[in-house]
Amino acid sequence: MIINKLDSIEFRLKELHDFTWLKKYGTAFWVVDETGSGCICIGMEDAERKYFCKIAGVNTLEAEVSPKESVVILKEAVHLYYDLAHPNLIKIIEEYDYNQFYVVVFEWADGECLFDHWNFETYQRNITMKSPREKFRELSVSKKLKAIEVLFSFLQNVN
């Protein structure tokens, strides 16, 4: 395990990489490095907006595929994003190859994952913390129905 750093954000990978080329999107403020996909996700922000940068070809600690396979998989996924374009689906700003990596830059979307398995132990240790799933369960019926309407609106696009 090697500690990598971009701005004040530290993350663990199997190898040391220089991610300073991401500085064109601003400053790093968030990272997910424990993925089985062989991708690392880095949140970047400049004075005007935030970006979600997904980078394939990185040898993550939890990778279930090789770096080269992760590049192929992400490139295939990008085609699906374009095919499924919808107002409620995160939008791709750009995608490109960079050295051995494949990079997809998305608009940032604030929110939480309803099934954030990486935090299960955190919620068990701190019973005062509510998981996103618990927060969703506590929403009013009208807000839950609105969420379902958004989901169904998206699913109408899927063939």
Regions found by a protein language model. Give the residues of each.
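Structural motif in protein kinase domains
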Residues: 109-131
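Structural motif at the C-terminus of the N-lobe alphaC helix and the adjacent alphaC-beta4 loop
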Residues: 77-87
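Short alpha-helical scaffold element within the canonical Hanks-type protein kinase domain
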Residues: 137-148
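Conserved short submotifs of the Hanks-type protein kinase catalytic core
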Residues: 99-113
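Protein kinase catalytic-loop region centered on the HRD/HxD motif
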Residues: 153-159
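Juxta-kinase regulatory segment immediately upstream of eukaryotic protein kinase catalytic domains
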Residues: 1-30
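Activation-segment/catalytic-loop signature of the eukaryotic protein kinase fold
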Residues: 95
